[in-house]
Amino acid sequence: MRAFAVLLIIALGWLQYTLWFGKNGMEDYAQVSNDVQLQEEVNQGLRNRNGQMFAEIDDLRKGSAAIEERARHELGMIKKGETFYRIIDENSEE
């Protein structure tokens, strides 16, 4: 009976060790949980960026205001009859 109790305590000790420090134990679980949370934050940022891009694509397909805005800011285009004024700061290095 005494040998059985010692064997049972050893088995329980081994099970506790593997639970806390072994492969797929609590330490690994905490690390994986942290990795999952970080990845979810990255994914949410990417979802937000995708939503903005889809909204911009939809705006470019349906309206001419977005196309005009891009032409003005990215390509420096102006409409007929408009005058373009460029104001340069005296402190600028250009």
UniProtKB/Swiss-Prot annotation:
Membrane topology: Single-pass type II membrane protein
Positions in the Periplasmic compartment: 22-94
GO cellular component, one term: cell septum
Side of membrane Cytoplasmic, spans: 1-3
Major location category of this protein: membrane
GO biological process, one term: FtsZ-dependent cytokinesis
UniProt entry keywords in alphabetical sequence: Cell cycle, Cell division, Cell inner membrane, Cell membrane, Coiled coil, Membrane, Transmembrane, Transmembrane helix
Subcellular location, record wording: Cell inner membrane
Keyword Transmembrane helix belongs to the record: yes
One Pfam family from the record: DivIC
UniProt feature coiled coil, ranges: 40-60
TM region positions: 4-21
InterPro entries: Cell_div_FtsB (IPR023081), FtsL/DivIC (IPR007060)
S-S bridge residues: none
NCBIfam families per UniProt: PRK00888.1
Family affiliation: Belongs to the FtsB family.
UniProt function note: Essential cell division protein. May link together the upstream cell division proteins, which are predominantly cytoplasmic, with the downstream cell division proteins, which are predominantly periplasmic.
UniProt subunit comment: Part of a complex composed of FtsB, FtsL and FtsQ.
Name used for this protein in its record: Cell division protein FtsB
Organism: Aliivibrio salmonicida (strain LFI1238)
Designated gene of the protein: ftsB
